[in-house]
């Protein structure tokens, strides 16, 4: 794929030749990035189906590459916005830990995102077969993969145990999906031998929600841990000193300060080129920039307005990652699905100006709430945010989940026009001419300029007469209130580019542990239809209906923008552009491929 350089010092991820050309143009002494021991995904080969089963899409297996004899040494230092305490048990772990763990990676999944697309390729599974009706998946577990800390070889028993942990989690964002598909009441699971796991979901499911659990790096992955460690040492030890399978294993950690990761020598897939990696928790952008400029950090999660600071460092370069994230603006308290029942969520409150006391979309109460929601959206100048805070590294977007290739599916009228005068008029029509109070909180998850862009939204709302209480708090503080459905404000929330919109739909259902604060009977019905549609045409038709309904009702999945990401590369490391996994690109990934200069 071809990309124009917005900045001559930026390396656009693409072919190795383009990468090297860009590096040399910047005067870097970096050379081609080789891989080390194990398995790499650039040159896939087909995995045949067995028993006459036909798969909707072919699966592939990675190929072996030569082993390097170089001895590991040195430390790779990385600056993160937020880590929290190290956690690794699939039942007890939430985000940001899920995402940080598999971006490193400490943890691995059955599949992995490719280097040149976000299609899922086999990793801990050598491949999988899918029945023609999409109901039975047979996973062929990779042989010879050892767990960290001496807990033996991974088998299908560990895989089923790990998925069961995810399915019974109160923190994992796709726990309800894992339970519905892998542990359905009408389904079954069979371990036919130590390396074969057969899952019958009871009813057919689209591959989209399944692949989201299989793929890394993502904040929604189902990773594999040692059942033996859990049984032998207990849940707490398995949670804080997790035996997983990644190229890095957890060593020492201190909450609020650092995670120290040790390289796994002779790793089955890719041995790191550094003996250690330390992930430092540094919430302030200015402190991360200072650490990079003084040479204490080799790379860090960076706001786009820090690009000039990075460029001032002798020998430093930048890697541009196109279409890395999409951001949405969510209004909480719209949990209509169980409103008025004993199971009503605490956040539901029809006194909130954007929440209707009647879930009937044809009711006057609903129409009034729509006016308020529309007023909030068209008060925001999305293009100005892209031009100023994202420095042009992105574009406006209408619906979250459709960001990227699926934007081509929007109907002509589906866009949010910046019109503050109309915003004020709509508020007056709804009975809020003098505005109202609202809490706005950025979900701090490592996306470019996520706090600054949310602050801009607060200012736009202030301009139309709202009294905005802006909360800048750690995501580990915010997220439990979203899970419990107690939060009643708005959030700016960045997520990954989806393989399909359906991938993000579970968080708008009543059964999901994580919630974007918007649940409705119509969405429950249509999301189920999309997620169980085996045929692509049927799934897309359901997605389009969902998108249109959310746009017309200004209800949920409201987009702000799609942004590229830019990762700083310090003078002591080489760029690794050909080894970035095209999964969730909010977090830096590919650390196991980074080489010293």
Regions found by a protein language model. Give the residues of each.
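Short Gly/aromatic-enriched secondary-structure transition segments
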Residues: 91-101, 154, 159, 213-216
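N-terminal lobe/hinge region of extracytoplasmic solute-binding protein
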Residues: 77-132, 164, 241-245
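Long beta-strand-rich cores associated with HINT superfamily self-processing modules
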Residues: 569-597
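Mature extracytoplasmic/periplasmic domains
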Residues: 391-413, 565-572
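Acidic glycine-/aspartate-rich tracts in secreted/extracellular proteins
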Residues: 83, 144-145, 204-205
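Surface-exposed binding/hinge segments that line
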Residues: 175-229, 571
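Extracytoplasmic/periplasmic ligand-capture domains
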Residues: 3-4, 12, 18-69, 112-116, ...
């Amino acid at each position: 794929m071809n990309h124009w350089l917005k900045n001559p010092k930026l390396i656009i991820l693409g072919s190795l030749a383009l990468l090297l050309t860009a590096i040399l143009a910047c005067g870097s002494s970096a050379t081609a990035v080789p891989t080390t021991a194990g398995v790499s995904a650039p040159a896939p080969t087909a995995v045949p189906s067995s028993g006459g089963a036909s798969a909707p899409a072919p699966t592939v297996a990675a190929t072996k590459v030569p082993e390097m004899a170089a001895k590991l040494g040195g430390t790779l230092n990385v600056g993160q916005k937020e880590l929290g305490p190290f956690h690794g048990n699939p039942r007890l772990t939430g985000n940001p830990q899920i995402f940080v763990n598999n971006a490193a990676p400490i943890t691995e999944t059955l599949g992995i995102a490719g280097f040149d697309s976000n299609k899922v390729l086999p990793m801990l599974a050598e491949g999988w077969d899918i029945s023609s009706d999409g109901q039975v998946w047979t996973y062929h577990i990779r042989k010879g993969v050892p767990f960290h800390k001496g807990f033996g070889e991974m088998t299908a028993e560990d895989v089923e145990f790990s998925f069961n942990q995810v399915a019974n989690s109160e923190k994992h964002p796709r726990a309800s999906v894992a339970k519905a598909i892998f542990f359905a009441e009408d389904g079954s699971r069979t371990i036919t031998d130590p390396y074969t796991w057969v899952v019958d979901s009871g009813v057919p499911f689209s591959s989209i929600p399944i692949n989201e659990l299989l793929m890394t790096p993502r904040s929604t992955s189902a990773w594999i841990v040692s059942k033996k460690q859990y049984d032998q040492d207990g849940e707490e030890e398995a949670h804080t000193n997790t035996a997983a399978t990644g190229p890095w294993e957890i060593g020492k950690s201190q909450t609020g300060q650092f995670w120290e990761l040790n390289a796994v020598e002779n790793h089955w897939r890719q041995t790191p080129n550094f003996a250690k990696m330390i992930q430092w928790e540094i919430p302030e952008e200015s402190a991360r920039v200072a650490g990079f400029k003084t040479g204490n950090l080799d790379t860090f999660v960076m706001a786009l307005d820090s690009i000039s600071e990075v460029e001032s460092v002798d020998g430093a370069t930048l890697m541009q990652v196109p279409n890395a994230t999409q951001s949405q603006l969510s209004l909480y308290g719209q949990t209509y699905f169980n409103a008025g029942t004993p199971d009503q969520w605490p956040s539901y409150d029809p006194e909130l100006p954007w929440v209707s006391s009647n879930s009937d979309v044809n009711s006057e109460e609903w129409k009034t709430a729509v006016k308020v929601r529309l007023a909030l959206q068209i008060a925001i100048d999305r293009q100005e945010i892209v031009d100023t805070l994202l420095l042009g590294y992105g574009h406006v977007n209408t619906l979250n989940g459709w960001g990227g290739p699926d934007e081509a599916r929007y109907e002509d009228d589906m866009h949010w026009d910046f019109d503050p005068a109309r915003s004020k008029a709509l508020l007056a029509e709804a009975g809020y001419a003098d505005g109202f109070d609202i809490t706005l909180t950025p979900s701090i998850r490592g996306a470019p300029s996520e706090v600054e862009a949310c602050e801009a939204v607060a200012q736009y709302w202030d301009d139309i007469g709202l009294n905005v209480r802006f909360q800048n708090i750690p995501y580990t503080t915010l997220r439990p209130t979203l899970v419990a459905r107690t939060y009643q404000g708005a959030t700016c929330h960045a997520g990954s580019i989806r393989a399909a919109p359906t991938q993000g739909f579970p968080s708008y259902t009543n059964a999901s542990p994580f919630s974007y604060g918007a649940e409705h009977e119509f969405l429950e019905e249509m999301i189920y239809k999309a997620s169980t549609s085996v045929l692509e045409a049927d799934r897309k038709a359901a997605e389009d209906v969902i998108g249109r309904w959310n746009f017309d009702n200004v209800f949920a999945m409201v987009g702000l923008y799609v942004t590229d990401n830019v990762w700083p590369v310090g003078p002591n490391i080489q760029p690794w552009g050909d080894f970035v996994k095209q999964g969730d690109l909010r977090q830096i990934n590919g650390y196991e491929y980074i080489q010293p200069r």
